[in-house]
């Protein structure tokens, strides 16, 4: 008990100034009054002391827990502050003391303002990141051709571990680059749209429909942001290229039509009123594609009007060329007929088709005709002397035929109205007939010389002249032999002498008379003569046959081009 008494007294003395000490004294008074045993008192006091110890232990444990929590909070605050410094790229917190001191609560109180400041900075930095990344996503969506609504549904992710100014500056640089790219694309779109409008105005097409067909956002009437994606830029560029090609194509067509109009005007001697309607087409001849930009200058209506005018003038030209060609053909035929040459055959329908199709130009056609006329005239000039002698021979042959018929007339010496006139003609005819042999020989010499010089046969109405003359000489010799035979027969049958001059043209057998009387103007040979049977075409075959001129003109034009 003594060992316990001291602690009790010590504890009692320590509790005198406390409520516990007061209660202990009150308990002792009660015990004294009751007469409680010391042992029991000691036991109760031990129980009280044990309970006090446990109460203190609980308080100490609670205090330890609180202290640990404060340590943890302080560590977490320090860690959070350090994290803020790292993610924000800050080296220190302004206003926070470098040395750490004081109680835990004081330390927490000292770090709390820095944490609040860093949280505010982080929140502000996150807002900046969200704003910049949102703009980046928006512009990227515009460049990619996605709608802003579709892109706004995407969540903006922020990396909390890197919110430094350096990272923010990188995003801002990216945003600045995207802004520049967007502006550049918008400028390209505006340039393309402006080019489409200018080209459409020049071509006379509706620019609004073309632009809307590419994408509705490009039309200002829709009031939405313009699509600036690569696909749209590609379509715009393709549209501009297509319009430029159409412009070049139309301009080339108008150049062709303008040259055709100019040539036709000069050829047809068109009036000023007819030309004035298409002066704008002629003005384009000296214009390059880059110079043609006036609205409505190369519309389809202008091209169609020019085509219609060219077609009209071509038809008029074809009609006049046909008239001119027929005139030249008549000149060629007259030249050939006068010189008894074969007329080159032509086919007017084929000629017209060749001119219309463009295979033969009217200039080449007329030049070919002029060349044929020139050749015909040159050949006619070379044949002139021979033809004149042939004509004289033909006339002499007619006289010879008439004289034969006259000599066979038994009543030629009878007194009649025309007897004296016929007698005088017979005298002249005998003189003419006597010169036929020399004339024929002269023609043969000249014709053979002409054939040697020209290296071709001399044709008279499509019949070889030399052969015709040789046949004539042969028949003339036969006729002389027949005359000689008849003379001998008469001498044998009639003893009286008869003057040869009076009996030269006595009656002849019917076969001889028929053969001689059937001789025609064409060299004095009838249809039954060998020369006419051989050359059945005759001497006067001057029909207008156009079967081969188209081919010959094409051949000659190709030769001249070669």
Swiss-Prot record:
Protein name listed in UniProt: 65-kDa microtubule-associated protein 8
An annotated GO cellular component of this protein is: microtubule
Site feature Microtubule binding, where:
426
What subunit structure does UniProt give? Forms a dimer. Binds to microtubules (MT). Bundles polymerized MT via the formation of 25-nm crossbridges following an intracellular dotted lines pattern and at the minus-end of phragmoplast MT near the nuclear surface.
Localization (cell): Nucleus; Cytoplasm; Cytoplasm, Cytoskeleton, Spindle pole
Residues forming coiled coils: 61-81, 155-190, 299-324, 361-381, 465-494
Provide the residue span(s) of the region labelled Disordered: 542-562
Keyword terms of this UniProt record: Cell cycle, Cell division, Coiled coil, Cytoplasm, Cytoskeleton, Microtubule, Mitosis, Nucleus
Positions with biased composition (Basic and acidic residues): 553-562
Domain of life from the UniProt record: Eukaryota
Q: What is the lineage of its organism?
A: Eukaryota, Viridiplantae, Streptophyta, Embryophyta, Tracheophyta
Does the keyword Cell division feature in the UniProt annotation? yes
Cite the InterPro entries for this sequence: MAP65_Ase1_PRC1
Q: Which GO terms describe its biological process?
A: cell division; microtubule cytoskeleton organization
Molecular function (Gene Ontology), one example: microtubule binding
What PANTHER family does the record point to? 65-KDA MICROTUBULE-ASSOCIATED PROTEIN 8, PROTEIN REGULATOR OF CYTOKINESIS 1 PRC1-RELATED
Q: Name one Pfam family in it.
A: MAP65_ASE1
Q: Which family does it belong to?
A: Belongs to the MAP65/ASE1 family.
